[in-house]
Amino acid sequence: MTAFLKFQRQMNLWLEQVVQHVPSLKQDIILFLSYGPKDLRCSVWQSEKTNLEQAKKQLLDFINEQFAQSPLDDYIKIDVAYNLTKQAWKEVEQQVHHQFHNNHYRKGIGFDEHCSVAFLEQEIYGKAIIRGLSYDKPNFFDETNLNYAVKQKYNAPKPQIKLQELQDIWTFDTYAAFYENEKFINLASGYDANGIRAISSNKKQHFQHLIEQNSEFLHDQIQENGKFIYGYFSAYDRDIRNYNTVRHCTSVYALLETFEVQSKPEYWPKIHAAIHYALTKFYKEKDSETAFMIDGKEGEFEIKLGANAAAILMLAKYQEITQKADYQKYVEKLANGILKLIDSNGSTTHVLNYPDYDLKEKFRIIYYDGEAALALLRLYQINQDSRLLETVKLMFECFIEKRYEKYHDHWLSYCTNELTKICPEDKYFIFGLNNYLKHFIFIKNRKTTYATLLEMLMAAYKMVNRLKEQGRTALFEQAYMPELQKLIEFRADFQTTGFFYPEMAMYMARPDKILHAFYIRHDRFRVRIDDQEHNLSGYIAYVKDYKGDEP
């Protein structure tokens, strides 16, 4: 049987199966077929708004014409639109404008009664028909983008859509399936996972596969000179032009972490290039014992506590994975740089000007403190320099006094887990518990895919597990382990909704450049290196350490 005949047969079977399960499809529906190569935004064909039999006939005629004599496209997806509902245009416009987070309107839209102009939810965002100027500016319908999308999509000319003159539109949900390995994979309908595949029953295997795919994506972002391609806004394949020392180093760190769950010797040349880039471009020695990592543009260079910490974490992880001490001298000088930014009470200074070394900002962002504490502890475990441990203990006195648990920060969770391995004192465990216990509701209701929440929860989980192993019953009972496990499962599942599976990537300008990347939906479908590293770290911890209900 030819590839085309297999595809045609599978499509018929899928449509029959959908009809059996969805009585509402007996009413008017629309069929959509999205198709395209790996390196271009997909095209989308649609049937008329009609009964299923008529729509199916139109679809089969189209696929005969499109694919019978030529190879199937790399990506093919079918959608059945249902719940076609007439709504006042102004109501939908306001709904989109007042969303709590951008780009979370999850319905398709038809712009006339017959839906002769209609777009799937994925098309609406892939073509920036709904967009925001930034993550903190409200969404709006872009009339120019809408009319350009209409012109691109339909062969026959369509009248110009003037948003101010619209009275009603028709919204709809879809049942969809993606054609992969000669079969159709069902995709979720509605809510946060709309239009993407379900997590397989073997969850760890599914996440392991995500790690493998995403680490390959992140590895591919390292250029020959060792610098990362920093990121893209996916809809129009626009590069994000900034760069950042902290994110460079922590992205290499996450790529090194992947060696804990997979063996990828082919990654080493680019990892070495990325480390070399960091040490030649950002590393500056103040004297023979002290070094700092610089960040920023020419004329605006600065020294960040977090950049020194990120570089130490990267180089210490390299030493842990390879058992080679090639970079230890750099790590020790960078640690001395951190010690210069911490006073005798454990209070930190976050940012200095470079090359003057004068104060720029005493405090910039909470995560520098936890990151610095973790970096010192990682080096302490390599060289046993007691100054490092004593400094972290002083820092923790400040964290506890200033009630830093209110920030539910992932780096604080990491460094607390690390410190309690070395100094298992109650006060440190209690701080670690409070870092997540007071934020259960916030985490449960968080409808964005920022990946640091899973990292924070997994570091806490490892710490709580040690309480259990050590028989510290009173503290363990305060940990609410069943609730913590539920939250971990929830976040691990939820964060897959920000992964560019092919069924989502195909609607963006260059699917091949963002396939298997993690993205931030509410910030213009942003793909940035730190979005990859945080997700990788969280999922690696889940695959390696999470036991769930296992005995």
For each predicted feature, which ranges?
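Membrane-proximal envelope and lipid/glycan-remodeling enzymes
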Residues: 1, 34, 38, 312, ...
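Extended, non-transmembrane interaction/recognition domains
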Residues: 48-209
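Well-ordered alpha-helical scaffold segments within catalytic/enzyme domains
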Residues: 190-204, 249-265, 310-324, 371-384, ...
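CBM-like carbohydrate-recognition segments
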Residues: 243, 424-427, 432, 442-551
